Amino acid sequence: MKVLLYGYGLMGKKVAHQLREKDEFDLIGVVSYEFDEKAPEAMYSNLTEVQDRADVIIDFSHPNNLDDILAYAKKNKTKVVFATTGFSKEQLDKIEEASKEIAIFQSYNTSFGIQMVTKILRQVAKEFYDNGYDIEILEKHHNQKIDAPSGTAKLLYEVMEDEIQGTTPVYDRSSLHEKRKKEEIGIQALRGGTIFGEHEIMFAGLDEIIEIKHTALSKDVFVQGALAAAKALQDKESGLFTLKTLY
């Protein structure tokens, strides 16, 4: 499977390393604004320079590159794994529209553990809510992360919103001078140090608290998930796939 990697930051380098180690993948090039002379693959500054056709693009870059990636993918019928966070509503709509022509996987978190957490939430969130439990999401990341709350925190909220319906996300309680409403789900972000990523869902009821927590101990969990998504797209002609629909 010919892979074109978009983005060569910390995550991109880890993805490239794993791709080189696996026989089922052929890393044909890397698109990055910063060239790395030590990289054994061809380095490109943009997609227009790429001559070989890729079977799949794995994107760990920036939302600003979306239009170029979709244009290349639609032209070459290339599948895309979007593992980038921070897409706007308009950009997500573009991804959905493009998926009518090509196969796309999009997730803010590609780890298997988060996939399991979302499955658990689909089973228990509504029951907790219906029995009067308050729901809060807390996420922690390193001090270099730009977006807040994290895409994964938004994903966890969306999973519960689908099950419960009628919920309202609350990102900042400092401006609210009223009691907590039942339909609210708080989403809070902490930034500091070198935390890879930690997400906690709290169900607070009368005299008891239940917590579901996922902690990433290295970025490798996201790499493995992205490669698994690329393999899963092999037999897909078109469509928009997520952790819920692909596995």
Label the model's feature ranges.
Residues L4-G7:
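Conserved N-terminal Rossmann-fold NAD(P)-binding element of oxidoreductases
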Residues L10-T48, G132-Y247:
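C-terminal substrate-binding/catalytic lobe of Rossmann-fold NAD(P)-dependent oxidoreductases
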Residues L19, A73, E96-S99, F128:
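A generic structural signal for well-ordered alpha-helical segments
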Residues E49-D68, T78-V81:
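Rossmann-like NAD(P)-binding element
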Residues S61-H62, T85, R191:
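Short glycine-/small-residue-rich Rossmann-like dinucleotide-binding loops
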Residues A71, T84-I104:
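Rossmann-fold NAD(P)-binding glycine/threonine-rich loop
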Residues N76-K79, E101-I102:
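A short helix->loop->beta-strand "cap" motif at the edges of active sites that frequently abuts
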Residues A98-S99, A103-H142:
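Hydrophobic, well-structured mid-protein blocks that either form specific transmembrane helices
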